[in-house]
């Protein structure tokens, strides 16, 4: 996948998601002693907390200092604020009133924050917390998941996850895994949305057990 162009990856994703949709209509969960197993109807992605330190002009980013409502006239690199808008939170170089993060509030506003948190205020735990869509018909908030996937397990080092977050752009069959704090992989195309510490973009062959 890493060698695909952005357009090729987008087409590949759409094809795979279409296959998952069909499978989700046909496959039922398997009830076992530990919980319920869903065989290959979900796909996994990663999201992260971008660090301001990675958004420099030397790396090709638009580092023009700008401010926005909620930032009390403090200025940050333009591309960093765009990344915070997409990911939800960002780690700043210098704390403001002991707060080391900013968060996207919607409606063009940001706010300073103590930590990246999930839907109900739980602090996100790297390689443990994950997000699902509010339209997911199979999983619920606060569910504990065991994800069996070579890609997920090798790239994140974890197979146990806790649902505590959501996102407007998350697909109903998507499980978005929280990577943690990191600098972006690069300034071009989809590299902007990828943490530097992993090559993972998508994992489609996943088996999910919802633990009791």
Q: Language-model segments: what does each one mean?
A:
Residues 21-212:
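Solvent-exposed, well-ordered loop and adjacent helix/strand elements within mature globular domains
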Residues 1-21:
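Short, low-complexity, charged amphipathic interaction modules
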């Amino acid at each position: 996948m890493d060698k695909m162009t952005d357009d090729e990856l987008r087409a590949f994703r759409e094809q795979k998601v279409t296959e998952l949709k069909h499978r989700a209509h046909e496959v039922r969960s398997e009830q076992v002693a530990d919980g319920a197993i869903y065989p290959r109807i979900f796909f996994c992605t990663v999201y992260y907390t971008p660090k301001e330190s990675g958004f420099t002009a030397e790396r090709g980013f638009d580092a023009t200092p700008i401010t926005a409502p909620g930032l009390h006239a403090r200025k940050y690199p333009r591309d960093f604020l765009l990344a915070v808008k997409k990911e939800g939170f960002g780690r700043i170089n210098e704390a403001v009133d002991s707060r080391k993060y900013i968060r996207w509030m919607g409606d063009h506003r940001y706010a300073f924050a103590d930590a990246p948190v999930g839907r109900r205020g739980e602090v996100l735990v790297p390689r443990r917390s994950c997000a699902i869509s509010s339209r997911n018909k199979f999983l619920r908030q606060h569910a504990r998941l065991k994800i069996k996937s070579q890609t997920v397990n090798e790239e994140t080092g974890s197979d146990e996850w806790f649902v505590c977050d959501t996102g407007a752009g998350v697909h109903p069959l998507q499980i978005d895994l929280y990577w943690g704090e990191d600098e972006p992989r690069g300034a071009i195309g989809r590299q902007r949305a990828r943490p530097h510490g992993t090559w993972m973009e998508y994992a489609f062959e996943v088996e999910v057990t919802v633990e009791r």
